[in-house]
């Protein structure tokens, strides 16, 4: 009966091992989690299992395959279950158990075993639609399990480091939560994304682009900062600045429009942030009031960098159709090559909305709105200054080559008469008092967030993965799609 995988099963025969175990705490209970490394063909991944899950699988299989004499280490009734020698011995016994499972095709092809090892998970199977360019440029001998963590020796991060207090936002792939770090009581916005949804929609490039852009935001006052990121086998976590003055969209809805000096102030801070992104060859591509936050003092903070395009210099173009319909530039709708000037179009659209209460070419019918953007002249109603009219006309120029910012990018925006009364140096140093104070009561005040979000129940699953599959920032990660996601801060920003 003792036989290894024969040639007929060579393609699907898994290789398994338990390289390590870790102690975890949940609701004041301690338990040991065993990390199972699974390899099938060129794919590798980790599965994190408790002893009880091994025991459940064992009891299921021994009834169906009594002749195979499977065994696992017995439960310990007396003594310390967390004694290092005991855990080492138990891990060896569990390792022997799973080694026996993969020696027999009838066992490793059994649904219970495949589920235990997550062999049918979509994220462990190659994607036949992967671009040929991506395949050809990938390194054939590179390991899939290395994470770029920055300086070595940085501490681990995991969901249980936080108390998740409130839902404060929601997107296509997950939620944004207000979280309090247990170590020091500091508040953060933690963006939690479901890997499964990201992978199913083939959006991992956008997620990694968002991470990369966030890492470059550290030194700009009007861009949200990433403190660190980490992952479990099911979720991705961005630990971000908690900015609690509310979305510009929230305040616009409440006030309908802003006085021109207030709109000018916000437009200047937004332009400064966009100019910085352009200087490091990043096009933002998704400027809209929902992505513009106010901090506790009333300064602008841009967030949500999922649609950013990296590596675009002032003379470069790209062609991807993306963004939000109300704010799309004509060249994007036409699917023509576009460049940095799409961001200046969006700035014009947001400035128009701040002054007049609606985007410039808004229509409930999206097709008609696209037609308006492409062909309808800009309607500038009374109530704003001549310089405001001028900058709106120049930013919302349908020909990108004639648009304000086409030649010298942010410098042209800075030099426009609309901003003549501003000192850009004082602006970046936050020496200009904001025209509106959100009047937040403290670092955890959520009054400026929509009750649609804050009244939601915080999902328990964000605190611990359902299969106890905690992946610290220092462990090897076997998911190709998110290699490099985990990020630990440089030494001056250590969080432990």
Swiss-Prot record:
The modification Phosphoserine is found at residues 126, 129, 486. ATP binds at residues 168-176, 191. Widely expressed, predominantly in the heart, spleen and 7-day embryo. The active site is at residue 286. It holds the Pfam family Pkinase_C. It catalyses: L-seryl-[protein] + ATP = O-phospho-L-seryl-[protein] + ADP + H(+); L-threonyl-[protein] + ATP = O-phospho-L-threonyl-[protein] + ADP + H(+). Residues 162-419 form the Protein kinase domain. Residues 12-124 form the PX domain. Serine/threonine-protein kinase which is involved in the regulation of a wide variety of ion channels, membrane transporters, cell growth, proliferation, survival and migration. This is Serine/threonine-protein kinase Sgk3. It comes from Mus musculus (Mouse). The lineage of its organism: Eukaryota, Metazoa, Chordata, Craniata, Vertebrata. The gene is Sgk3.
């Amino acid at each position: 009966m003792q036989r290894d995988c024969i040639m007929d099963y060579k393609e699907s025969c898994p290789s398994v091992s338990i390289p390590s175990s870790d102690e975890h705490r949940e609701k004041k209970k301690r338990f040991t989690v065993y990390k199972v490394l699974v390899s099938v063909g060129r794919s590798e991944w980790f599965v994190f299992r408790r002893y009880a899950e091994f025991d459940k699988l064992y009891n299921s299989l021994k009834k169906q395959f009594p002749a195979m004499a499977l065994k696992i280490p017995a439960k310990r009734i007396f003594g310390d279950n967390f004694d290092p020698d005991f855990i080492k011995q138990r891990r060896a016994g569990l390792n022997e158990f799973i080694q026996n499972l993969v020696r027999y095709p009838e066992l490793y092809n059994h649904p219970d075993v495949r589920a235990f090892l997550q062999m049918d998970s979509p994220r462990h199977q190659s994607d036949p639609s992967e671009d040929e360019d991506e395949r050809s440029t990938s390194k054939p001998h590179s390991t899939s399990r290395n994470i770029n963590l920055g300086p070595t020796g940085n501490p681990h991060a995991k969901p249980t480091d936080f108390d998740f207090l409130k839902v404060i936002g929601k997107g296509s792939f997950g939620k944004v939560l207000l979280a309090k770090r247990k170590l020091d009581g500091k508040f953060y916005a933690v963006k939690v994304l479901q890997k499964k949804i990201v992978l199913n929609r083939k959006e991992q490039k956008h997620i990694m682009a968002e991470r990369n852009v966030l890492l470059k935001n550290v030194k700009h006052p009007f861009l949200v900062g990433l403190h660190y990121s980490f992952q479990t086998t099911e979720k991705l976590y961005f630990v971000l600045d908690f900015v609690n003055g509310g979305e510009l969209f929230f305040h616009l809805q409440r006030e309908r429009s802003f006085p021109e000096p207030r709109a000018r102030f916000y437009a200047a801070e937004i332009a400064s942030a966009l100019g910085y992104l352009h200087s490091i060859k990043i096009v933002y591509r998704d400027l809209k009031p929902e992505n513009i936050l106010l901090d506790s003092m009333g300064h602008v903070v841009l967030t949500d960098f999922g649609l950013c395009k990296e590596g675009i210099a002032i003379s470069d173009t790209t062609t991807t159709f993306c963004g939000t319909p109300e704010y799309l530039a004509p060249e994007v709708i036409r699917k023509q090559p576009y460049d940095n000037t799409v961001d200046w179009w969006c700035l014009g659209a947001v400035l128009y909305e701040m002054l007049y209460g609606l985007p410039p070419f808004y229509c409930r019918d999206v097709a008609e709105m696209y037609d308006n953007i492409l062909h309808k002249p800009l309607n500038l109603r009374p109530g704003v200054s001549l310089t405001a009219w001028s900058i709106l006309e120049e930013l919302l120029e349908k020909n990108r080559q004639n648009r304000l910012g086409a030649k010298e990018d942010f410098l042209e925006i800075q030099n426009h008469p609309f901003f003549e009364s501003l000192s850009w140096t004082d602006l970046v140093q936050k020496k200009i008092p904001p025209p509106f104070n959100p009047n937040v009561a403290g670092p955890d005040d959520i009054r400026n967030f929509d009750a649609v979000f804050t009244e939601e129940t915080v999902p328990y699953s964000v605190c611990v993965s359902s299969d106890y599959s905690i992946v610290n920032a220092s462990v090897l990660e076997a998911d190709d799609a998110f290699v490099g996601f985990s990020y630990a801060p440089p030494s001056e920003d250590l969080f432990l």
